[in-house]
Amino acid sequence: MGSDEREQAAGLFQRAYAEQMAGRLEAAAELYVKSIRLHPTAEAHTFLGWAWSFLGRVDDAIAECHKAIAVDPDFGNPYNDIGAYLIELGRHDEAVPWLKKAMTAVRYEPRHYPHLNLARVHLHRLDWALAEQELRRTLEIAPDCEPARRELGRLLAKFN
């Protein structure tokens, strides 16, 4: 694979991301696919999965995350994304190992997301103590995370 293909793939990825941010998800997906054909990266597979999820194609999103992990197992985002998609599907217990893998991934930003998602699992299970622990951990990592702050406030209000 030459540097030309890599550069072309990177350009397609950037265009895909711009399309996605503009809400043109089908166009974004097409560009991610083209980028992957030229030079597959964990990022491109993960972002294609993200586009599929917004289009309601959650199973395809999960499949892309598995492909991302195969390309680069150190990239943490697809682990968290699989966990989030499983939560979305109501498969909370299946989400936990994926979220824990995201927490320990070598290359992952933003680090607070798997903690926030694990808190969602604990809230679903009505395990208030573990939910509080994960929400507090989320806020240690990302003090400005409003969803965690709001959820922690709601949780603590239940016991006051």
Q: What are the roles of these predicted feature ranges?
A:
Residues 39-40, 73, 107-109, 143:
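Short coil turns that delineate tetratricopeptide repeat
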Residues 44-45, 78, 112-114, 148:
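TPR alpha-solenoid repeat register
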Residues 3-4, 36-37, 70, 106, ...:
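Structural signature of alpha-solenoid helical repeat scaffolds
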Residues 21-33, 54-67, 89-104, 113, ...:
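Structural signature of tandem alpha-helical TPR/SEL1-like repeats
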Residues 5-41, 47, 54:
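Alpha-helical segment of the N-proximal tetratricopeptide repeat
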Residues 1-4, 120, 124-160:
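Terminal, low-structured helical/coil segments at or just beyond the last alpha-helical repeat
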